[in-house]
């Protein structure tokens, strides 16, 4: 992420027996927002099978979760190994995990209430699940088989690791924005596309929470990004300009992923901070930016980057004005704020 508080009063019904949680407005009742809690059943299976052989414990988890959301954990030895490791970790320490499960309902309700100030008609287009991600994500959308089902997944284990503080609600705003933005802007492979998606998600959080810290904006994972990028600002701008329309994953990884091998001393995920600056350089508010489709967004993103480059007096070339052919993603890569 990927990697935000409160308009209307909200109440929460947390139904652990079936794993279904409902967040609804109390008085003037907008449609209820539901999420399914799969994190608690995972832990219940872990506790109930404590002391049994690993194979039996893994099978019990799979049976319990598959009955609620088939295909969440793909078949295979690699997934089984991660389930086993997660079961062991829960047997050692589950307090942070439990706290994440407990904090999630209020944080989600607060994020939705705040989000609706800018996007009053918002309702999640995807079913939302809280689950044990086996160390894979704190949040993001994904496609599950069978049936190519599109879902929104929040990982209680990585929420416990990265957002066990005042960054949880801002993080949820970041992810809610991705859902809203996807109504107008399609996933595509070029660096500028992914940079634009993450840029606007950070800008949305900054707009809705004007006093947000860099920690709340996810600009300190895995270490502080802003100052380190400012020190190499020209390098960051020239990298994005040179790879603006690159459709291979290497440039996107370098700019936006942890462990992505950023160039020339730039920090991991430097693109999140550069993207925030780029979004702000457009001079447009987040509501208007969110409604641009791919064709309309590229020239605005390109012009904002060119402005930043002019302000920084860099000598490298700006991206071409003419639109590149956009390669649409067919599967919809997960966007997780990371």
Regions found by a protein language model. Give the residues of each.
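Bacterial N-terminal signal peptides that target proteins for export
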Residues: 2-14
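Bacterial N-terminal signal peptides
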Residues: 11-23
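Sec/Tat signal peptide C-region and signal peptidase I cleavage site
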Residues: 23-29
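Acidic/His-rich structured neighborhood in mature extracellular/periplasmic domains
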Residues: 85-223
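Small-residue-rich helix-loop
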Residues: 218-237
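Pan-zinc metallopeptidase signature
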Residues: 236-327
């Amino acid at each position: 992420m990927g990697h935000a508080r409160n308009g209307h009063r909200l109440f929460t019904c947390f139904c652990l027996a079936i794993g279904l949680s409902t967040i609804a407005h109390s008085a003037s009742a907008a449609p209820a927002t539901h999420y399914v809690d799969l994190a608690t059943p995972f832990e219940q299976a872990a506790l109930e099978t404590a002391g049994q052989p690993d194979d039996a414990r893994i099978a019990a988890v799979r049976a319990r979760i598959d009955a609620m959301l088939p295909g969440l954990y793909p078949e295979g030895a690699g997934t089984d190994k991660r389930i086993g490791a997660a079961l062991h970790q829960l047997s050692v320490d589950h307090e942070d995990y439990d706290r994440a499960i407990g904090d999630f309902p209020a944080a989600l309700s607060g994020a939705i209430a705040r989000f609706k100030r800018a996007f009053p008609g918002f309702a999640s287009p995807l079913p939302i699940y809280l689950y044990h991600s086996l160390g894979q994500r704190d949040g993001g959308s994904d496609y599950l088989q069978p049936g190519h089902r599109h879902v929104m997944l929040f990982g209680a284990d990585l929420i416990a690791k990265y957002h066990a503080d005042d960054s949880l609600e801002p993080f949820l705003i970041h992810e809610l924005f991705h859902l809203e933005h996807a109504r107008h802007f399609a996933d595509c492979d070029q660096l500028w596309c992914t940079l634009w998606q993450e840029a606007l998600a950070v800008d949305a959080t900054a707009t809705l929470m004007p006093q947000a810290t860099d920690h709340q904006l996810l600009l300190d994972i895995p270490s502080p990004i802003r100052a380190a990028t400012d020190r190499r600002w020209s390098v960051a701008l020239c990298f994005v300009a040179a790879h603006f329309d690159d459709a291979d994953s290497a440039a996107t990884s370098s700019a936006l992923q942890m462990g992505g091998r950023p160039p020339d001393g730039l920090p991991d995920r430097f693109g999140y901070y550069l993207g925030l600056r780029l979004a702000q350089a457009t001079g447009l508010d987040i509501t208007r930016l969110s409604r641009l489709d791919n064709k309309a967004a590229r020239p605005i993103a390109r012009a904002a980057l060119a402005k930043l480059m002019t302000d920084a007096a860099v000598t490298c070339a700006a991206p071409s004005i003419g639109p590149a052919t956009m390669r649409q993603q067919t599967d919809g890569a997960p966007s997780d704020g990371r």
